[in-house]
């Protein structure tokens, strides 16, 4: 995430907005691909995968 060109002179709300759009688009892509994968797997396996994914993302964001 550090390689994203966000200038430190930009206002805080603008940086938050850009980061929010990036994170939400990444999550959207992840859930879209997970949905297509879920068709071929059992729902229980899919739900376990989803919770692990979101836990990893939350831990990563909390460590900033």
Swiss-Prot record:
Its main location: host cell. GO terms for biological process: transport of virus in host, cell to cell. Keywords: Host endoplasmic reticulum, Host membrane, Membrane, Signal-anchor, Transmembrane, Transmembrane helix, Transport, Viral movement protein. It is a single-pass type II membrane protein. The chain crosses the membrane at residues 13-30. GO terms for cellular component: host cell endoplasmic reticulum membrane; membrane. Residues 1-12 are cytoplasmic. It is found in: Host endoplasmic reticulum membrane. Residues 31-64 are lumenal. Required for cell-to-cell movement of virions in the host plant together with p7a. Belongs to the gammacarmovirus double gene block protein 2 family. This is p7b. It comes from Maize chlorotic mottle virus (isolate United States/Kansas/1987) (MCMV).
């Amino acid at each position: 995430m550090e390689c994203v060109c966000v200038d430190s002179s930009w206002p805080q709300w603008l940086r938050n907005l850009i980061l929010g759009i990036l994170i939400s688009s990444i999550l959207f892509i992840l859930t879209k691909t997970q949905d297509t994968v879920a068709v071929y797997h059992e729902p229980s396996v899919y739900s376990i995968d989803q919770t692990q994914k979101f836990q990893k993302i939350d831990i990563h964001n909390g460590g900033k």
